[in-house]
Amino acid sequence: MAAAQPESRDGAAQSAKPASETDPLSRFTCPVCLEVFEKPVQVPCGHVFCSACLQECLKPKKPVCGVCRSALAPGVRAVELERQIESIETSCHGCRKNFILSKIRAHVTSCSKYQNYIMEGVKATTKDASLQPRNIPNRYTFPCPYCPEKNFDQEGLVEHCKLTHSTDTKSVVCPICASMPWGDPSYRSANFMEHIQRRHRFSYDTFVDYDVDEDDMINQVLQRSIIDQ
């Protein structure tokens, strides 16, 4: 079986989101949903999207490519890229086990070690717990960081951003993280769409006791996310 390092074809290299060259998934990742391509389609500018993601991007009157901002039009099936996804192996960031690229989506939803990998990313943006308390925003509803829309629950905010702002590249503060006791209200995510889809697939408010310290809080989130798998 092939390793996840061959030269990319069908525009896969251009379609990949900005990522470390050491990430074997970066060349096979849809820039909209940030998952391994499903039914990849290559558009005229050379970039590649999942078929379903492309359909969403084509809905505006004047659709543009979310990667290069050129005019967007229906594309053609990326047959060679699809073949690679069905034959190339990569490893899970959590358990390090190898999987075919087409199977990695399903695996990470049930891998407890991958959940730990995700939470390490959350902790990387936290503040020192010894800082003075501050006014904490409403943790149950959130404003959109891109537009005036507000009063979204967590799931609603994720869906709104995916449908309305998937091509917006502006750096913004995550309103969900900013509402948490450990959150930094001045920290701007360089890729907010990736952040919100990878970090906020479950609700912190359901899982944590806000009276405990940061480490205990993170552990509570992890334990519940593992149980709920």
UniProtKB/Swiss-Prot annotation:
Q: Name one Pfam family in it.
A: zf-Di19
What does the PTM comment state? Autoubiquitinated. Polyubiquitinated in the presence of E2 enzymes UBE2D1, UBE2D2 and UBE2D3, but only monoubiquitinated in the presence of UBE2E1.
The residues listed in the UniProt record as binding Zn(2+), with positions renumbered to this chain, are: C92, C95, H107, C111
For this protein, the Enzyme Commission number is: 2.3.2.27
Signal sequence region: none
Q: Which Gene3D superfamilies match?
A: Classic Zinc Finger, Zinc/RING finger domain, C3HC4 (zinc finger)
The annotated consequence of gene deletion is:
Mice show no significant difference of viral resistance or augmented antiviral responses compared to WT when both are infected with virus.
GO cellular component terms, alphabetically, are: cytosol; nucleus; plasma membrane
Q: Which UniProt keywords apply?
A: Acetylation, Cytoplasm, Developmental protein, Differentiation, Metal-binding, Nucleus, Spermatogenesis, Transferase, Ubl conjugation, Ubl conjugation pathway, Zinc, Zinc-finger
Task: List every stretch annotated Disordered.
Answer: 1-23
Tell me yes or no: is Protease among this UniProt entry's keywords.
no
Please, which domain of life does this record's source organism belong to? Eukaryota
Which sequence positions carry the modification called N6-acetyllysine?
K103, K113
Q: GO MF terms on file?
A: transferase activity; zinc ion binding
Catalytic reaction(s) noted: S-ubiquitinyl-[E2 ubiquitin-conjugating enzyme]-L-cysteine + [acceptor protein]-L-lysine = [E2 ubiquitin-conjugating enzyme]-L-cysteine + N(6)-ubiquitinyl-[acceptor protein]-L-lysine
UniProt function note: E3 ubiquitin-protein ligase that promotes the ubiquitination of various substrates. In turn, participates in the regulation of many biological processes including cell cycle, apoptosis, osteoclastogenesis as well as innate or adaptive immunity. Acts as negative regulator of NF-kappa-B-dependent transcription by promoting the ubiquitination and stabilization of the NF-kappa-B inhibitor TNFAIP3. May promote the ubiquitination of TRAF6 as well. Also acts as a negative regulator of T-cell activation.
Q: What is this protein called?
A: E3 ubiquitin-protein ligase RNF114
Q: Which gene encodes it?
A: Rnf114
